[in-house]
Amino acid sequence: MGRGKIVIRRIDNSTSRQVTFSKRRNGLLKKAKELSILCDAEVGLVVFSSTGRLYEFSSTNMKTVIDRYTNAKEELLGGNATSEIKIWQREAASLRQQLHNLQESHKQLMGEELSGLGVRDLQGLENRLEISLRNIRMRKDNLLKSEIEELHVKGSLIHQENIELSRSLNVMSQQKLELYNKLQACEQRGATDANESSSTPYSFRIIQNANMPPSLELSQSQQREGECSKTAAPELGLHLP
């Protein structure tokens, strides 16, 4: 069974991308060396990795190769303006073709203009869509998981705040109840004292004296033990004829 067609696009996984770069870099350097030996060509190869590391190969001397390239480029561009125009025209045509291919690929991914695709092309498109959907779902699941964890944290904080507020309300209610009971007790004592002072009974008694005619005395009755006053009760003398 033959190898499947590899889609040429950027590798998202950094580890896989580094492994692929290492393998293909070694293969490219090997091919450049073989080309210089087999065809007696002067070859200069410069490669920069995504991290900025330099890899190079030259069949003779890299500086010599670069100088030769610079001189040839200047002769090509400076000697003939028409050639420069043609070069830019080819570059523009290549960019237009790349843009067209990208637009076609985008339409196919959106399910448009599929009539010109064969079974293999459709299978490749389906595989690309499945990979895209898998990546989208994975990203969505990660976002939802993060949001759920954040909501759990917020819920725990709110629950703790509610507990603290409930405790504070209970303390305030207890203090309010104690204050209310004290106020009620004070009001009851005040009312009792007022009733006792306003309803103190009076009694009459007849005082007889040998030297004086009999008289009628008005006096307050003795209050409850421990609450009566030590002052003498007022006397109202009525002399009988």
Curated annotation (Swiss-Prot):
Q: What happens when the gene is disrupted?
A: Increased number of tillers.
List the keywords (alphabetical).
DNA-binding, Growth regulation, Nucleus, Repressor, Transcription, Transcription regulation
One GO term of the biological process aspect: regulation of transcription by RNA polymerase II
Give residue ranges for domain K-box.
Answer: 85-178
Q: Does the UniProt entry include the keyword Transcription?
A: yes
Location in or out of the cell: Nucleus
* Positions of the UniProt region annotated as Disordered: 216-241
Q: Name one GO cellular component term.
A: nucleus
Q: Which cysteines are joined by disulfide bonds?
A: none
InterPro entries for the chain: MADS-box/MEF2_TF (IPR050142), MEF2-like_N (IPR033896), TF_Kbox (IPR002487), TF_MADSbox (IPR002100), TF_MADSbox_sf (IPR036879)
Q: Which GO terms describe its molecular function?
A: DNA-binding transcription factor activity, RNA polymerase II-specific; protein dimerization activity; RNA polymerase II cis-regulatory region sequence-specific DNA binding
Q: In which tissues is it expressed?
A: Expressed in seedling roots and shoots. Highly expressed in young leaves.
Does the keyword section mention Electron transport?
no
According to the entry, every stretch annotated as the MADS-box domain falls at: 1-61
Role played:
Transcriptional factor that targets the CArG motif 5'-C(A/T)TTAAAAAG-3' in the promoter of D14. Directly suppresses D14 expression to control the outgrowth of axillary buds.
Q: How does it assemble?
A: Interacts with TB1.
Q: What is this protein called?
A: MADS-box transcription factor 57
